[in-house]
Amino acid sequence: MSSMAKSPDMRTPGCCSPLRTKELLERQRSSRCTPAKGYLTPRNCQSPKHPEMRIPSIFVTDADYGLERPKQLLQRLERSLYRSSSASKVPPKHSLLASQNRQRTWEGPKTPEFRSRTNKTIPASEPRPRRAKELLEDLRSKHQGTPATKIPSQRNPKENQELSKSHTCIPSSEPQPIRPKLILERERQESITNRLASTSIDRLKTKPPRSSFTSSRLLVPQMGFSYPKDPKRLHESDKGIKLTTSKRKLDFKTELGTDWLRRELEKIGKEWRKKTDYQLRQLISGFVKQLVRLLPFNGITFSHLSRDCYVQQMVEALQQLQYTKKVNKSWLQTPNSTQAIAHVLELLNFLLDVLEHRKGEGMCALPVVSEKQRIEQLASASGTSYDVMSLQQKFENIKIEKERLNNYQESLMPESPVSKDMDKVTERDGNQDFVRLLDFQKETLHELQLQRLRLQEFSELVSLAKIKLKRCCKANKQCIEAFNDQIQDLADCVVLRNRNIGLLTQLHLNDNPKEEELHERMKQLQRLYEDNYSNLLQLNIKPPQGSP
């Protein structure tokens, strides 16, 4: 008994063990027999207070109070929902349905001895639960107005009999259960309609949807939003329309190509050509007024008095930017006049060029140009050469220095009369001495010029002598080379005696021979001629004149 008392499955119906909290609660619910709660199915409730306990579309048989298992409870709920949905189509033929062995089993002990009594199966005559596809077909046929006898014709005859039995067993006066999905849909529908009504008070042009059913989670209509079609009207069209939202696709171009820029410039050029001269001048005058607003962002500071006058602001900006040309305020006041349009265009060109070369946080950066570069730019602009421009610059610098010296001398000169007389005397003496010095300088200069001419003449004579000497040296070298060649030929000659071969080799001359060497060579040649006179006659060589 102890083991049976501990195990909940081995408990007998007559056992006096305490019930669990769950069992007590479910027995209490089964005794109340609330129709909305379909969790418990009491059987054969014959109490005087409740003569007939039942859930809609399900009759309770005479049996002991017990609990259903979850699977059996789910099957019973599906059958009850099926009966409630089909009760409106087929009128009931019988008022009540007999029990037909519809007793539910208690969740009693699971021992083999009690299992044969408790586990009762559902008979085959019980109607099976319908599928979702069949329920959808029933709904469509109901909306289209088709007779209820069309659907059973598509099933087996056995199913038709079961349906006819199930239709007859449900009275039409019983309340039909509502599905949880429909309840949630109705609640969501009410909240959506309330929200839409509150948001569409100020929007008179927006039309509310025909029905509150929508598959979108958007509660407030947005741009490009379209309400979906009512699902009740989907069967009217051959093809169902998808419940989707249509939104516009915006094509943003992040990169601008050269072709696009060229087209835009052509459009701007065409528009400018269409305008008259007066319109262009008005446009330029407006641009001059608006350009002043950009100057503070590029390092220009305006005074307090010039904040309301763009002309004064423009003049101050040009002064700070070191504009070199002439500026007239009347040009800025009437920039569209024919006299001022050219000057205004030059001003705009200068200001826009300065605005382009900015650095950092909106500060304008002026190019650093040296004095030499400035002179070169001016020379290139005027077309004159750099030398002329440099001379002019030097001349101007000399003038400035001379003025400074004169001012300094005037500041140093005393103002007393005695000093003035002394200055006159010194000026006279200084002038006479200066004249003498000038005469002496002229004489010396003349003498120096004469000496220079003499030196120049002497240098010319020296250069001529050098040329002649070079020519003589060259001729002497040629003569010495020819003499040496002839002596070598005589040494190689067979006619001469062998004892004179040594003398012949000594007759050669150097490049710079002296007079003594020349006289010796002449004497040696005379001896050689005398010794070989007979041989020379055989060769028909005439002796030199004056020789024997």
Swiss-Prot record:
Location of region: Disordered: 1-51, 82-181
Composition bias, Basic and acidic residues: 20-29, 104-116, 127-141, 156-165
A GO CC term assigned to this protein in UniProt: kinetochore
Matches recorded under InterPro entries: Ndc80_sf (IPR038273)
Motif interval(s): SXIP motif 1: 149-152
Residue interval(s) of motif SXIP motif 2: 168-171
A molecular function GO annotation: microtubule binding
Region feature (Important for kinetochore and microtubule localization): 100-253
Region (CH (calponin-homology)-like region, which is not required for kinetochore and microtubule localization): 237-372
Stretches of the chain forming a coiled coil according to its record: 386-457
Subcellular location: Cytoplasm; Cytoplasm, Perinuclear region; Chromosome, Centromere, Kinetochore; Cytoplasm, Cytoskeleton, Spindle
Subunit structure, as described in the record: Interacts with Eb1 via the two SxIP motifs; the interaction is not required for kebab kinetochore localization.
Official protein name in the record: Kinetochore and Eb1-associated basic protein
Protein's organism: Drosophila melanogaster (Fruit fly)
Annotated gene: Kebab
